[in-house]
A protein has these predicted regions:
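Amphipathic alpha-helical assembly/interaction segments
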Residues: 1-113
Length: 113
């Protein structure tokens, strides 16, 4: 078992979390304390699930939950772009990070089935 903080998927998720904390500061008040907080919470939960999956004997269900979380994060990011809370450039950057995490989770899931 690898240390969780050495996993590429953990590192990519942590980088995504940092980026989310940076850009949610720019949200209008209406979105900062609703969608912004939900986005942060979902990303923190994603990182927690990656930790749990790494330390669990049966990883599959936890990885599936993590994949659900990354899709919710993707949805929130798209919503914030459509509501003009983040620029298209920022959305593309965040979406690349989300896609990177998603691909790694999918690969991890395939490796444990």
């Amino acid at each position: 078992m690898s240390k969780y903080d050495e996993l590429p998927v953990y590192k990519a998720s942590y980088d995504l979390l940092l980026e989310i904390f940076r850009f949610t500061k720019e949200f209008n008040r209406e979105f900062k304390y609703t969608v912004g907080e939900s986005l942060k919470k979902e990303t923190l939960e994603l990182i927690t699930l990656i930790y749990r999956a790494n330390s669990a004997r049966e990883k599959l269900e936890t990885i599936k939950l993590a994949r659900e979380r990354i899709e919710v994060i993707r949805l929130f990011a798209r919503l914030m772009k459509d509501l003009r809370q983040i620029s298209l450039k920022k959305f593309v950057q965040v979406n690349k990070q989300v896609e990177c995490v998603s691909k790694q989770l999918t690969g991890w899931q395939k490796s444990v089935t």
